[in-house]
């Protein structure tokens, strides 16, 4: 079975590496163009490109997978199936109809819930207790195709984005092998999604990162952990836009929203609209991430200061 893999970030790269190491015949790779990344804005290859080069798999990086160059590449490698994971761009009808066995996407949510670009962040932000991975046959509508395989996992109350993503990557790797083995022998039963139950996980915008301490402690906790460790939830402290990481506890006792009540080696207790949260780390502009205790000792922060939420960002 000839496989073309389509994906871009680390999530996709780990799945591709797993397929190749397990002997699957990946005949081609499509990934996004290299882009400037990090603080120095240095142009770096996508993680999927790195894996393709390592294993000498032919690859392309088109601006659009639906244009002539990409279609010619796909036809030249002749895939039986196309596997997509976190590619970041829409596949058109010509691509979807090209492989004889179809195109399948590995999506980190329990479809039809959380269709879209940011399912892991949104399930955490909304305080969901369960999530999972869905492999489905792609159709023109976003994340709306019939389901081939789905697995569910529970979410720890204080689990961060990084932690949950790692577990979903491992689950995706296991499921990709199971799915392709079944596809190889024609043992796939597709189940239509219940579109009436669909919810959406839109792309993250900068304003989504801002912590509103006037909300209850549970909501504040969920906001911070949804973007921990990247790109980091934001709040304003004086004139600084800072990042917050590592909520380790919540408390029902009241306090003023945003008020830094107490700092020790374990973190800072910060007031919310209902209750308090204990946050472990903070990052000031141009500085490394540090504990609140380090920030206090460095005279960057003291008890009695207040975090604010601003709309002018």
UniProtKB/Swiss-Prot annotation:
GO CC, any one term: cytosol
GO MF entry, a single one: methionyl-tRNA formyltransferase activity
Residue numbers binding (6S)-5,6,7,8-tetrahydrofolate: 109-112
Enzyme Commission no: 2.1.2.9
Enzyme class: transferase
UniProt xrefs under InterPro entries: Fmt (IPR005794), Formyl_trans_C (IPR005793), Formyl_transf_N (IPR002376), Formyl_transf_N_sf (IPR036477), Formyl_transferase-like_C_sf (IPR011034), Met-tRNA-FMT_C (IPR044135), Met-tRNA-FMT_N (IPR041711)
Disulphide connectivity of cysteines: none
Catalytic activity: L-methionyl-tRNA(fMet) + (6R)-10-formyltetrahydrofolate = N-formyl-L-methionyl-tRNA(fMet) + (6S)-5,6,7,8-tetrahydrofolate + H(+)
Keywords for this protein: Protein biosynthesis, Transferase
Primary role: Attaches a formyl group to the free amino group of methionyl-tRNA(fMet). The formyl group appears to play a dual role in the initiator identity of N-formylmethionyl-tRNA by promoting its recognition by IF2 and preventing the misappropriation of this tRNA by the elongation apparatus.
HAMAP family in the cross-refs: Formyl_trans (MF_00182)
Family: Belongs to the Fmt family.
Protein name: Methionyl-tRNA formyltransferase
Annotated source species: Thermotoga petrophila (strain ATCC BAA-488 / DSM 13995 / JCM 10881 / RKU-1)
